[in-house]
Every structure is written in structure tokens, then in C-alpha cells.
Amino acid sequence: MSKEFDYIIVGAGSAGNTLATRLTEDASVSVLLLEAGGPDYRFDFRTQMPAALAFPLQGRRYNWAYETDPEPFMDGRRMECGRGKGLGGSSLINGMCYIRGNAMDFDGWAELPGLEDWTYLDCLPYFRKAETRDIGPNDYHGGEGPVSVATPKAGNNPLFHAMVEAGVQAGYPRTEDLNGYQQEGFGPMDRSVTKKGRRSSTARGYLDQAKKRPNLTIVTHALSDRVLFDGKRAVGVTYLVGDSEERVEARARKEVIVSSGAIASPQLLQRSGVGPRALLESLDIPVVHDLPGVGENLQDHLELYLQYACTQPVSLYPSLLWWNQPAIGAEWLFNGTGIGASNQFEAGGFIRTRPEFKWPNIQYHFLPVAINYNGSNGVKEHGFQAHMGSMRSPARGRIQAKSKDPRQHPSILFNYMSTEQDWQEFRDGIRLTREIMAQPALDAFRGREISPGAHVQTDEELDKFIREHAETAFHPSCSCKMGTDDMAVVDGEGRVHGMQGLRVVDASIMPLIITGNLNATTIMIAEKISDKIRGRKPLPRSTAKYYVAGDAPVKGKALREVKQA
């Protein structure tokens, strides 16, 4: 194998696979793609069956299984922080919800100095480029992209429809497309699943078309040790293969692109000598470039579940029983249909809890079964739940390498629930969710409130429940943010400030977290920056219309109003 390439990409995840595929469309360009995990085994139902999404989080084959430091505002809990490991990265283990964020998120990015070409209308063409939606393209959706997007179909679970109707009856808008003209409101939720009912990871969508190209070299089980520099220029990478302690060196003629995700990208930069001077010196790491923002500005989405018993036998509870699972698996394996072919997040919504929020600050995922996201603590009866989470918390955390050892996980602290806004949003969110769940559309299905339980009413009782039960939505981001201020790490093209030949391209470069799931936006970022790297003209700006709430009320009058503490 040649040890010199034009580009070295560290991380074959949502961004890295997109970059590798686009860069190698130019036959004269050579790319080395390094991935610490293994292949995305297509026979492994745990990653390929949409309904099995909880399984990869339960082990370490596909999951880095990071843990936070004790979170000071969450009763000192060490909280789960799963990230994908293997070809596809977190697109190999995520919940497959295809949500792009709100148009106002990107317009907000573009208001920051140096990010003027990140408006929603600049980004929308790249969302479309990446996507093939099963019902065809329009102004908002693509029809020829690598990411297969499935829309909910007639005849799916009646609880999805009842939950959307309940949201509308509670006074919120109805939207036909959470990724279209109007995100705000309740409606069907798209998912990154192929027409044959398989997970549409970036390994399947992007690498499958690129991996046979002679100018792309993929090395799995390759854990990057550090980036190599000649002065301020990145010239290569050293990495470990498997359990070996021997460093392998590869050289980059043009650039090293770090696409290791919001946890591992800042850690790799720090181990390589790019980061806050005081941290590097405390670890005896020679300082290549003092860049204080590396690992700072860390953001995430926190969420919790409101669970209800279901009085009709229409939930997915029977699918949790082992004796029903062989038939579900067989239908999925041979036909690509049935319960196994969906992630079962086919309805959701976005709302504003208070007028001061100019676009939605709460997201809902509806699930027709009562169970934890990671597959634990399944309620042993028919039930359903709403996942409710805040979208743009003011809380900021950080990532810090603990040593030079690439196998040692970093110190992670999100500072969840560290601001008064966090507590207000979650209290409001729980109370508004209860009002939604009390609407007539759910009368035929709604039993008792299982969690938190109807007895949990006061601010103090709600706060206790939040501290004990809120958990990550697995959306870490913003730890190597784009921008020009003193804490920015990269510019609007992903180039690391003060360095040459070094970029970061992944969810870590978001300056502010978006309103929704991160995967589609991470892919969009890589699509957009790949054109920059290739020296191509950007795709023409979209002219699509999009909704701005303006002075519109947060909600209308609920059909059934609910008195709460």
C-alpha cells in the first residue's frame, strides 16, 4: 500500500464517507480513509434492521460507549455518550430520523462573521444533493442522492396518526413535511431507510459507490494516534492497526481532514498539539498551535420520555416478546417489510413553549411502545411514549484529552441543565406534553401515565424527575466550531485557524446546535465543504420559500384544556 496520498481523512462516519466519495470522483485525486472500527457487516441485523436500532448501543463492536464525567446538575450522574464505530460512524447506529433542522438555525449561523454563505438557502441545495426521497423530489427534497429517505405510508400504526391529531387539537400547527416549508408543528417523520427496508448509512449510500475506485484506500481497525506537522502544516497521520502498538505513518500531499466526530475530533487535535496551551502542557504534549477553542463550546440535546399505558392492543409491545421476533426478522430479511423495516419513529413535531423563542425550542419523537431508547426498561404491557427534548440549550461543555494515549477516552462534560432556561424548558415541555396527550384524539388509546406518573406535578417534583431520568439524544456537536472569534477553531470551509493543510469536517464544526437530529446536517456540511476542497463553484442558492413564525402565537386554544400545578 502506498503511504502517500493527496488527502487523508480520519474517520469513516457521516462526514468522512461523504468527503471520501466526493473527493475521489476526481480520478486524479488519491484518498486514504482511516476508520478505527470495522466494516459495516451487511448480515448483522443489529445495524441493518431499522427496528433493531437499540442493539448497537448495548455493546462495543459498533459503539465507542463514552461516558461523561459526573454531571454536576444531574445528581452527579455519569451519562451515556454513545458514538458510532465502524464504516458509517454514527449513521451506522443512530435512530435513522431524517430531520435537517430549522431554516432559522442556518440563517443564524450565517449572521456570524465569516459564515455568510451558510444561510438555509445556501445549504438546501446540498441537502437535496445528498438525498433520494422515496416519493420523489421537489423544491426541498432530492431524487438522485446517496441517502435513501423513506416517508411514512398509509396503514402504519394508528398511534402515529392519533399523536399528530392530538398535537393539532392542543392548538399547534399541522405540517405535512418537517423538512419542507414549515418545520413547526406536528406531522409525519421521514427516516433514512432504503426501499428494501435497510438502514441507509453513509457506508451503504456513499462508500458502496466509491469503495472500488482505485484512488480510494480504506483501512479499518485503524485508530489514529496523531496528526503530523512540518511547522504549521499538516503533512500526515500516524495510526495503530488493531491491537498493535506499532505506529503506521501515512503522508498527505495536500490535506489531512479530521472527521472523527464531536468527541474524537477535538481529542485528536489536542493529542497532536493543537488546542489550549495549558491543557497540552499539563499532558506533556508539545504545543504545535495554541488554539483555545478546541474541545470547548460542546453542545447536545437532552430528552426524556413521557410514557402511557395503551388501552387497545395496537402498540409494538408484542414485538418485544422473543417468541414473536423470528417471524418479524424473517419478514424483514426476505421481504424488507413489516415491523422490522421501520425505526418506528414515524411521527413527531416541533413547538415553541414561549413567545420569546422565534422558532421551535422543543422536539417530539413519538414511539408506539414504552421502552428506553437503548432497549432497556421495556414496560411489560401495551404502551406508547413521547420523547420530548429541548433544542438549543445555553449550556456549554467541553472535551479534554486525558493523555497522549489514543486508546484512552477523553474527559467529557456537557454541563447539562446548568442554566435556568434548561429547567424552564423542561418543566414547560412536560406540562405541554401532558396537555397534548389529554386531547380527544388519544381517548381511544390513552391509559394511565406510567412515567413520570400523574402524581409528579410541582416544579420540585418535575425537577427531581428530570435530574434522575433525562438522557442524551446522542447529538454532541460544536466542539471545534466554525467562525472568526477567539474560540473558533475553523473557518467557514473547515480550515483550522493558524494552520495549513488541516481541516475539521463533521458535527463538531457547527457553531450552534440545530433544531433537530444531526445526521442529515452533518452530511450536508460535508457535501458543501467537499465542493470547496475540490475548487468547484457552489451549487446555486435555492429560491424555495420557508416559514418564519414572526408574531404568530405559540399555540391556539386547545380543544381540551388541562389544569396542572
Curated annotation (Swiss-Prot):
Active site: 475
Keyword Transferase attributed: no
Catalysis: reaction(s): choline + A = betaine aldehyde + AH2; betaine aldehyde + NAD(+) + H2O = glycine betaine + NADH + 2 H(+)
Listed pathway(s): Amine and polyamine biosynthesis; betaine biosynthesis via choline pathway; betaine aldehyde from choline (cytochrome c reductase route): step 1/1
GO cellular component entries: membrane
Required cofactor names: FAD
Keywords, in A-Z order: FAD, Flavoprotein, NAD, Oxidoreductase
The protein's Enzyme Commission number: 1.1.99.1, 1.2.1.8
Binding site for FAD: 6-35
Region (Disordered): 182-203
PANTHER family hit by this protein: CHOLINE DEHYDROGENASE, MITOCHONDRIAL, GLUCOSE-METHANOL-CHOLINE GMC OXIDOREDUCTASE
Name of the protein in its database record: Oxygen-dependent choline dehydrogenase
Gene (name only): betA
